[in-house]
Structures are given as structure tokens and as C-alpha cells.
């Protein structure tokens, strides 16, 4: 089994749970524009938010307007408080390729920016999705492991499990730091395409996000049983 099949099988088994298991609160306080978010659950509302912010981004006439949207999505919605103004301005002024060329540096932030700049093309890469992709490869003992850079998480379970599997993960084949994000996008899109039923790469991203703790613990237990 390869990584794509492992993720595809996981997605087939769990895509029906996405509306109930994906949880991320939306607080529109401090949002510089007025939006009416629709949806019956957290998943639908967050998808709607992403695309409405994209529309507002396209309608923005000035750098300041674009900056305020990107800052809100990273800082307020995403809860990433570590970026200074200069960094957020860089994420606003840079082209998508310039951001991708930064590699893993700041990816949990700049991939959020890309996901509203062009949600048709891009998706978020953060500590939870990184853990899930690596965990699935351990759980299913895929034929050719691919290294996806682990990131520091605010979640204690994910950080603990990351430490338990890091020796194994570090041995895997590594893409160039400037290339793995595109590999990640391609993987999500291929799985969504094979899944059918109008699934998108955002759905696969959100599945990985939602199941991160469960997959992390399964991978850590699997790894410990092999030791």
C-alpha cells in the first residue's frame, strides 16, 4: 500500500463523519468586513468562510484591505499569534510561489493565507494535518514512506506522539523543503478526485485535521509495539 491508498481508504471510511467531527469555532469579532456565514455545522461554516474571504480578497482594492483579511484569518481565526506585522505584510505581498519557496518556515501561517487567496488551488498545512499524514503511513506501514515535516502543535497529545515517532519519521524519504507542500496539495487533490461525490482537497485537509489526535495515538502505539 502506498501513501495515496492509505489516505484514500481512510477518507472513504470517514468522509461521512466530517460534518460531525470537524470542530473549529468561528468568531467574527475584529473581522474588517461584514459576512453572513451559512452552514449547518462547523465544517460547512468554515468552508463558506474560506470562500467568502476569498471573494472579499479579490474585491479588495488596496494592500491594506488584503492585509487585514489575511491577518484576521491567521491571527484571529487560526489563533496563530506569533507573527509580527512585517511577517504578515510579507505573506500579503508575496506571490503564492514565493510563499511556497519558503518551505516549512511559517507554513502553518502562510498556507492559511494561500487558502483564502486561492482556495481552488491551495489548502492549509499545519501541525495536525502533518501528524495525520505521517501517522497514517506508520499505521498502514506503507511501501514507500514520504516525510512530511512535523510542526509544533498547541495540542499536548500531538506533541507527545510526535516525539514518540520522530526517530522513525526522520528516516523517511524527504522531498526538497520547497517542494513538499506541492506534493501535499497533489496528494489531497488526487484522493479527493478518486473519492468522488464532489469531494475537494479541503475535505481531505479537514479530515486530517479532525482525526489528528486519534491517528497520533494509534501511530504512537503501533510504533511502541514494534520497539
Task: State each model region's role.
Residues 7-99:
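Long, highly charged, low-complexity intrinsically disordered interaction regions
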Residues 94-118:
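Helix-hairpin-helix
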Residues 41-44, 48, 65, 104, ...:
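Alpha-helix boundary/N-cap detector
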Residues 78-83, 121, 137, 212-216:
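Short alpha-helix boundary/capping elements
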Residues 88-94, 100-101, 146, 150, ...:
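Catalytic cores of nucleic-acid editing and processing enzymes
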Residues 115-128, 135-141:
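Catalytic Zn2+-binding segment of zinc metalloproteases
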Residues 62, 101-102, 117-121, 172, ...:
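Conserved aromatic-histidine-acidic binding/catalytic patches
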Residues 1-29, 127-132, 140-227:
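C-terminal accessory module of base-excision DNA glycosylases/AP lyases that mediates lesion recognition
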Amino acid at each position: 500500500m502506498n501513501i495515496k491508498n492509505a489516505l484514500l481508504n481512510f477518507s472513504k471510511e470517514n468522509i461521512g463523519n466530517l460534518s460531525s467531527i470537524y470542530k473549529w469555532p468561528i468568531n467574527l469579532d475584529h473581522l474588517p468586513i461584514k459576512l453572513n456565514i451559512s452552514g449547518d455545522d462547523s465544517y460547512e461554516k468554515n468552508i463558506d468562510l474560506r470562500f467568502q474571504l476569498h471573494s472579499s480578497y479579490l474585491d479588495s482594492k488596496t494592500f491594506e484591505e488584503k492585509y487585514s483579511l489575511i491577518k484576521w484569518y491567521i491571527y484571529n481565526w487560526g489563533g496563530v499569534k506569533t507573527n509580527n506585522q512585517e511577517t504578515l505584510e510579507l505573506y500579503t505581498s508575496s506571490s503564492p510561489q514565493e510563499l511556497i519557496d519558503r518551505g516549512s518556515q511559517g507554513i502553518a501561517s502562510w498556507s492559511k493565507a494561500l487558502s483564502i487567496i486561492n482556495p481552488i488551488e491551495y489548502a492549509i498545512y499545519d501541525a495536525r494535518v502533518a501528524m495525520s499524514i505521517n501517522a497514517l503511513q506508520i499505521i498502514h506501514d506503507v511501501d514507500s514512506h514520504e516525510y512530511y515535516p512535523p510542526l509544533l502543535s498547541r495540542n499536548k497529545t500531538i506533541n507527545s506522539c510526535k516525539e514518540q515517532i520522530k526517530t522513525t519519521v526522520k528516516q523517511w524519504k524527504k522531498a526538497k523543503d520547497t517542494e513538499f507542500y506541492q506534493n501535499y496539495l497533489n496528494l489531497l487533490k488526487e484522493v479527493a478526485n478518486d473519492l468522488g461525490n464532489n469531494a475537494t482537497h479541503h475535505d481531505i485537509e479537514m479530515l486530517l485535521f479532525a482525526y489528528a489526535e486519534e491517528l497520533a495515538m494509534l501511530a504512537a502505539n503501533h510504533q511502541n509495539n514494534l520497539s
